[in-house]
Amino acid sequence: MIDFSTFRSAVKPKERTDRYNILSAMFVLNAHVKSVTATEISKFLKLHLGTKAPINVNASLRAYDADVSPTDSGPPIQWSLTTSGLDHLRSLSGLSLSVTADDSFESDIGIVCALEYPELAAVLKAVGGATAWKELGDTRHAHVYREAQILAKSGTTLRVVSTTSTSMGLTAAAIATTQLVLQFRPRLVAMIGIAAGTRSGGKQFGDILVADPSVDYNSGKVVLENGIREFQPDPYPIGLNPRVRSVLQKYGSTHEVFQEIRARWHGRAPTAPNRLYLGPVGAADQVIDDATRVLEIQKNWRKLMGVEMETYGVYRAVHESPEPKPRAVSFKAVCDFAAEKSDSWQNYAAFMAAEFAIEFFKREWTALWPTK
C-alpha cells in the first residue's frame, strides 16, 4: 500500500500543488474503492500538511470534475477517484498505482467476538449503542455483520465491521475471521471478549489480557513411555505485529485510561485499579474449571497470563490471509481464574475489554497506521 509520504517524495516541492495533494490523499483514503467526503479529505490533509493543507477542499473537488466524481449527493456529498483521476495521478507522480481488489483495504477494523452476549453487546454499546450500527452483508453467509463508524482523536473516521462466530472455539473463530477478512478487507482484526486469568502477577477481574503470542497449548503429540501416557507439546505460537506491540506497551501499567473507563461502569467493580497485561495467552477448544490444568500448561509457558478458546484461531486466520494482510490483536478481560467458574464478573469483563479496545483505537489509530 502506498502512503502519503511516498506521493510527497515522488515529485519536486513546486509540483506538490493542491490538486496533487488532494488526489494523493484520495488514493491513500481508498477513494478509488469506496467514496469519501470532503471533510475526511480535509482532515487527512491537515493531519499531514498542517497549515499548508488546501483551504477549501470542497470547492477544489467541484473543480476537478475530470478526476473525481460525486457518488452520493448527500449531504454530505461522497466523492470517488475516477479512472481519469488515477491516470492523472500516475502521470504526475510516476508511481504505478495498482487498484485491483487484492491490493486495497476496504475497511479499517474488523471485530470478532465469540458470544453475542455479553461480548458483542459490550462492543455495540462502546460504539454508540445498537442504533449506531447497521446490518450488512450477503444473507447467504452464515455470519451476521454489523457496520459502524468511530471517530479517532486525530479526526479520522474509521469504518468498523463486527461479527460473532457461530460457536465458541478455535475452529469457529478461524472461520468467522476468514470470512470477515475476505468480505470486508479490514486493516486490523480485533478479537474482543472475556478469558480466564492465571493467579500469578496479582491479576484481578476486568484486567485486559493481550495475547503476545497466542499459543494453541493442545497442539502436540501423545506418546506412551514406560506404560505412562504423556503429552509432548509442539505449538506454533503467533505473536503481534511489532508496531502494534510497541504502541500497546504504553498501556502496560495502571494507565489513566482504565480509571476513565471504570468511571463509566455502574455496578460492582474490583477495589484496585485495572491494568493491561501483554504476554502469552493459551487457547484451546476446552473450558477449564480446574486450577491444576492451568498449572500443567504453565510448565511449558511459565509466563502464561490466561487461557481462552478463540484468539489462536483469529491470529492464525489473519496470519494466512491474502495480501495485503491485516494486523491482528486480541483484547480479553479476566472474568474468572479457571476454577470455581461463575458468571458474576462476565458483564464487567466484557465491558472493560470492549471499552478499552475502542478507546485504544480512537487514541492510537494514527500511531498504528501513520498514513491514514
Where are these regions (language model features)?
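Short alpha-helical segments that sit at the start of domains
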Residues: M1-A25, H32
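Short acidic, hydrophobic short linear motifs in intrinsically disordered regions
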Residues: H32-L45
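Helix-turn-helix/winged-helix DNA-binding modules
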Residues: V33, L49, P76-I77
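Short amphipathic alpha-helical interaction segments
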Residues: L49-A63
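A short, conserved structural fragment
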Residues: R62-P75
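Accessory beta->alpha helical hairpin/"wing" motif in late/C-terminal subdomains of nucleic-acid enzymes
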Residues: D72-S93
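Intrinsic-disorder/coil detector with helix-boundary
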Residues: G94-T371
